[in-house]
Structures are given as C-alpha cells and as structure tokens.
C-alpha cells in the first residue's frame, strides 16, 4: 500500500483538532511505541506486547522479482528449486516480519543457509534489486511501483510468493481510548482495507499473476 495516501488523509487532523502536531517516523518498533516515542505504529506482524492494542488490517503479499538486466544475463528461473543458483535479496533478520518461507498454494519452499542471501533494509534491498544483484522475495510492490510498471523490474516464478504477513495498526493500551488516537487509527485502517488500486490483489491482476495461489491464514 502506498503510504503517501495515509499521510495526505492524516494531514486534515490538525485542521480539525487545533494544536495537534503530526510527525511521521520510520522503523518504530514495539519498545519505542511503549516508551512514547510514537503514539501509533503500523506493523507487518502481530505484536505480542501486553501493553499494546493491535487492530488487524488485512495482509500484504509480495511476489518474487528481479531486474530485467539480471534476467537477461543469468540462467532462466523455471522452477523454485532453481533459486539455489541465484542470489536472494531479502529483508534482514532484525525485521519483525522476517520470513524465509516461500509459498505457492499448498507448496512451501524455504530459503535456507545453502542459498546465497543478500540482506538489507527496504532501501538497500531496492538498490540491490535495481542494480541486478539477484532475486528479491519480500519487496512491497508499491515501493517498486515505477520499476514494475516500466518493466525495469519483472516478476519471477509467477504464483510463488513470500509467506503473507499480517498488517496491524497499534497504539499503547493506555491511550487506546483517546478520541484523536482512535480517529487516526480508524482513518489508517479504513484506507488500508479500501485502497483497492494499491493492494496486493490489484498488483497481481495488473501483472497477470495467479492470485488463486495465495492462501491467506486467519488474522
């Protein structure tokens, strides 16, 4: 989902609530939220901290991608087992939504230690992907939208995808009844569930990927 949509919608809150100041931060974890370094956080997993309230917002599903440059200069990837011969670009293990599991309907494939793995944060992974360093497994399609639409980056192994991760909007339990906090969380959740042009299903349809191969677990 395109985060700019949320930023634009939330900008109206200070107009409605004079004196309210908004600040957007990256990479706020559970502890930072508990410590008051942020009041609301978006997580790609369900937090277990008892001091937090987590409201589900559906799932995000990425698909495997590589740059057109990489695909032209390397052996064709015909089946998931061929990934052993290609560097894998993925988010590092410090990311709470980290997963090494690829899925295709009822089939699973693990990116194990025998694979060559290039770890990084989202920016580093995007850079490695565009530079043609390997196959990325957990890039948010909205983060590489321009490259997907102009063909610089292309899907690999249609139907295979990283294990879906559950999206949650969270706040401290102590502030969960604050009307402004509730209003902001409601705006974010509504947009997350109704921004059809930017959800994972829309990307699958746009790129002619088999949506039926994605089996979502219950939140």
Give, region by region, the residue ranges found by the protein language model:
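C-terminal effector-binding regulatory domain of bacterial HTH transcription factors
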Residues: 144-146, 150, 160-219
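Hydrophobic hinge/microswitch elements
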Residues: 109-155, 161-162
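A local structural motif
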Residues: 17-25, 107-116
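Secondary-structure junction motif
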Residues: 86-108
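Central regulatory/effector-binding core of bacterial HTH transcription factors
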Residues: 1-50
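Flexible hinge/capping segments at coil-to-helix
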Residues: 51-57, 61-62, 66-89
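Beta->alpha turn/N-cap motifs
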Residues: 28, 44-46, 66-68, 121, ...
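Short, well-ordered beta-strand core segments
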Residues: 39-41, 63, 88, 136
């Amino acid at each position: 989902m395109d985060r700019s949509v949320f930023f634009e919608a939330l900008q109206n809150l200070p107009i409605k609530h004079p004196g309210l100041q908004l600040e957007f931060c990256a990479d706020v974890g559970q502890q930072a939220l508990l410590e008051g370094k942020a009041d609301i956080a978006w997580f790609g997993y369900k937090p277990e901290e008892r001091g937090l309230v987590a409201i589900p917002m559906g799932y995000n599903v990425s698909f495997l991608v590589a740059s057109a440059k990489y695909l032209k200069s390397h052996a064709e990837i015909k089946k998931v087992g061929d990934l052993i011969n290609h560097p894998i670009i993925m988010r590092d293990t410090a990311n709470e939504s980290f997963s090494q599991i690829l899925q295709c309907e009822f089939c699973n494939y693990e990116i194990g230690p025998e694979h060559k793995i290039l770890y990084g944060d989202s920016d580093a992974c995007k850079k490695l992907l565009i530079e043609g360093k390997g196959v990325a497994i957990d890039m948010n399609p909205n983060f590489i939208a321009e490259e997907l639409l102009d063909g610089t980056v292309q899907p690999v192994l249609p139907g295979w995808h990283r294990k879906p991760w559950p999206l949650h909007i969270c706040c401290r339990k102590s502030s969960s009844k604050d009307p402004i906090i509730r209003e902001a969380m409601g705006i974010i959740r509504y947009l997350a569930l109704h921004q059809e042009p930017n959800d994972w299903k829309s990307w699958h349809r746009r790129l002619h990927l088999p949506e039926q191969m994605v089996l979502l677990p219950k939140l």
